[in-house]
C-alpha cells in the first residue's frame, strides 16, 4: 500500500474543534504516514485589545495533543518579502514543500482539505500532475457543522463560554489560561 503525506496549510487562529477533527481525520487514516501542518504567523485581532498569535495557536495545538502526535510535522510558514513588506503564506509553503520534496519521498503527496475548500485540491493536482507523485485523497474531511475561528476569537475576547469551540477532552479553563 502506498503511504501518503498530507500537507495542511492554514492560519488556525485559534484552532477550534473543527480544526481538531480535521487534523485527526488525517492522523487516524491508516494510509497517511505523515501530516505536515504549515501555519501562518499573522495575528488575528478582535478590536484593539485582543489578539491570537502563532504562539497561542501552538499552545492550543499542543493542548489538543496534535503537536505531540508522532505522525505530525508542524512548521511555521516561511517569512517572505513582498512589495508591501514581509508576510507568511502557508499555502505557498505547501507548494514549495511539494516541489522541493516530491523526488525525495517515497510517499504520495496530498493536500489536506475540508469540504469547504475543495477547489484548492483541483489547482494543486493540476499544478503537480505532470512531474510529482501527487494524489487526491477521496476522503476529504466533511464538517458536520461549521465552527468559526472568528466566533471563537470573539467569545474569547468577550469572556464568554468557549465550550462549543473546543474538543470534548479539553477544559475551557485550559484554553483561557493560554490567553491570561
Range-by-range predicted roles:
Residues 1-180:
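Nucleotidyltransferase catalytic core that binds NTPs
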Amino acid at each position: 500500500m502506498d503511504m501518503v503525506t498530507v500537507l495542511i496549510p492554514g492560519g488556525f487562529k485559534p484552532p477550534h474543534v473543527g480544526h481538531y477533527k480535521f487534523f485527526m481525520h488525517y492522523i487516524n487514516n491508516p494510509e497517511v504516514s505523515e501530516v505536515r501542518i504549515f501555519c501562518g504567523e499573522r495575528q488575528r485581532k478582535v478590536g484593539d485589545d485582543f489578539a491570537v498569535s502563532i504562539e497561542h495557536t501552538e499552545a492550543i495545538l499542543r493542548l489538543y495533543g496534535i503537536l505531540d502526535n508522532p505522525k505530525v510535522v508542524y512548521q511555521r510558514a516561511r517569512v517572505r518579502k513582498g512589495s508591501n513588506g514581509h508576510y507568511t503564506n502557508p499555502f505557498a509553503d505547501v507548494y514549495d514543500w511539494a516541489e522541493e520534496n516530491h523526488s525525495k519521498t517515497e510517499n504520495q503527496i496530498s493536500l489536506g482539505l475540508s469540504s469547504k475548500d475543495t477547489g484548492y485540491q483541483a489547482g494543486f493536482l493540476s499544478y503537480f500532475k505532470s512531474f510529482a507523485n501527487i494524489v487526491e485523497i477521496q476522503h476529504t474531511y466533511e464538517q458536520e457543522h461549521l465552527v468559526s475561528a472568528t466566533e471563537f476569537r470573539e467569545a474569547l475576547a468577550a469572556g464568554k463560554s468557549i465550550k462549543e469551540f473546543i474538543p470534548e477532552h479539553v477544559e475551557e479553563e485550559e484554553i483561557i489560561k493560554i490567553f491570561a
